[in-house]
Amino acid sequence: MKVFATDLDGTLVHNKKVTETDREAIAAFQKENLFGVCTGRPLSCLFDVEGIPFDFYIMCTGALLLDKDRHVIEEHLLDKELVRYIYNHYRDYSNIIVQTESESHFYFTDFIDFPTFTMIKDFEEIKDSKFYLNTHKPQVSEN
């Protein structure tokens, strides 16, 4: 048996969709092997891979591990005060995504357009108590 995990954006997902060829290859691979997803996205942002029965999920840049039924195997949460500190001190240097335990949405700074994201201006707007954190460096043009 082999185990294979894929990223989504720019790897499996192109132009917000998965090709039929990739879907067929995944189904064939899964007949004797395990196929999972490994992404920075939270669980609520898998809308463009609907219909792919992943055998495991590595979400939130490794902070959340789920089995095929989406039961938590392991999670690494951050304290709200630590997330607040990081957000307040580093938001000018990096695009910071603050992901919460809420599956319906999560909060972020201002650089990604996803239907399940809610933009915040102040960290105090976040009412959830469990946090994951992601950072993305702004892309720099090489002109």
Description of each model-found segment:
Residues 101-143:
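Conserved acidic, metal-coordinating active-site core of Asp-based
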Residues 1-2, 30:
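Extreme N-terminus of proteins, especially the signal/transit-peptide cleavage junction
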Residues 2, 94-96, 143:
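Hydrophobic beta-strand segments of well-ordered beta-sheets in folded domains
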Residues 2-16:
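Asp-based phosphoryl-transfer active-site loop
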Residues 20-117:
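Active-site phosphate-binding/coordination module
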